[in-house]
Structures are given as structure tokens and as C-alpha cells.
């Protein structure tokens, strides 16, 4: 039996660093909600059985009319952290017929620069892998170590072998669910899915990502994202 593909978009964050009262995933960029670009990229990939958006139970900003015509489902099962939201979403995927052997691609709602081409590159690279992996970029900048709360450089860190994690992150549903559960039992709240997979003793792979697939986090990021989204994505 061929494994199916599901997408999971954790969308329960408040965007506290973005400088806006409106959660960043609902801010308008180039005429559309930021979340719209993420959903449109996955909607363009007919390979997916379902795309599930996880929002907070008390989300008062989500308006399905802003995403009319796109294929996705929504569940109000967001948790107190990304890890909790992803875990709850994985459980909800069973409602759509997902099994432990199926693949899930978890993607940040705040990465609107994702493209169908990059999604398909990740799938093509990992569909036969025993573990799965992520899109990422080799670190290009020089890294400085500074003590917490300070501003004095302690040392320069080698960037050799360092990659900056992006999303989507692609793993088997059962493996990822078990890995997150193990991390939770061990008292760890990890910031991405690959960290949970690593914590469980597995070795994810990296697939070359894209600079346009950056995470919108700070106020100045919105102008950059809008400029990128106004331009057609290059095929890759």
C-alpha cells in the first residue's frame, strides 16, 4: 500500500514579536492574508490527501472567507506551544484516514514564501527514506557567541556543517507522534519536528531550501515578504 501525504500547518501562535495586535498569519501581504500563500502552495500540490490547519480554540481572527477556493480543513485544537499544537494536529489527522505509515509535512504558517516546487523537491528526496527530513539552508553568516543578557562577544563559532532549519519538515505520522510524546514525557518542549525525531534517536536528512522561504517574525520582515510575494517564484 502506497503511503499518502498530509500537510499540517500549526497556526495557533499569537505573533508577539511581529509588533501587531493581529496575529501575523492573518496580516495582509500583497493583497492576501499571509496564511493564504502557505495554503495556496499546498493546494497546488494535488498529491496531498488533506491539509490541516491547527488554530487556537479561542481564535477570533480566523475567517474562512479569506481562503475561499483553497482545499484545507481547520481544527481548533492548538496547544500552548508549537510542539503541543503539532501533536494535537497529528491526532486529528486520523479523522481524515491518515495512518501511522503515512507522511506528514509540517509547515510554519508564517513562511509564505514556500512554493509547490520546493514542496515537491522535499517529497522527491525523502519519499523512500526510512526517517524523513527537512528543508534547510547552510549558514552563511559569521556566528558570534554572546552570554545571555550581555553584549560582549565571547568567541566566534565555526559555521562549518551548520544549517538553518526551515519547513516543511517531513516525517512518518507514527514516528513523529511517538517522538513528540517521548520528548513530552522527558520534559522537553522542542521548537521543531526534527528536534523531536533526533531526541528519539533517529537521523533526519536535510534538503536544500530557499532564501524566499524565510519565517516572517519581526515588523521589518513584512515589507521583505511583501516584496518577495509580489514577484513570481522561480521554478526549481
Swiss-Prot record:
The record marks 17, 24 as: Transition state stabilizer. Keywords: Isoprene biosynthesis, Nucleotidyltransferase, Transferase. One of its GO terms (molecular function) is 2-C-methyl-D-erythritol 4-phosphate cytidylyltransferase activity. It comes from the Bacteria. Its EC number is 2.7.7.60. GO terms for biological process: isopentenyl diphosphate biosynthetic process, methylerythritol 4-phosphate pathway. The record marks 159, 215 as: Positions MEP for the nucleophilic attack. It catalyses: 2-C-methyl-D-erythritol 4-phosphate + CTP + H(+) = 4-CDP-2-C-methyl-D-erythritol + diphosphate. Gene3D superfamilies: Spore Coat Polysaccharide Biosynthesis Protein SpsA, Chain A (3.90.550.10). PROSITE patterns: ISPD. Pathway: Isoprenoid biosynthesis; isopentenyl diphosphate biosynthesis via DXP pathway; isopentenyl diphosphate from 1-deoxy-D-xylulose 5-phosphate: step 2/6. CDD domains: CDP-ME_synthetase. Transmembrane segments: none annotated. It holds the Pfam family IspD. Belongs to the IspD/TarI cytidylyltransferase family. IspD subfamily. Catalyzes the formation of 4-diphosphocytidyl-2-C-methyl-D-erythritol from CTP and 2-C-methyl-D-erythritol 4-phosphate (MEP). HAMAP family: IspD (MF_00108). This is 2-C-methyl-D-erythritol 4-phosphate cytidylyltransferase. The gene is ispD.
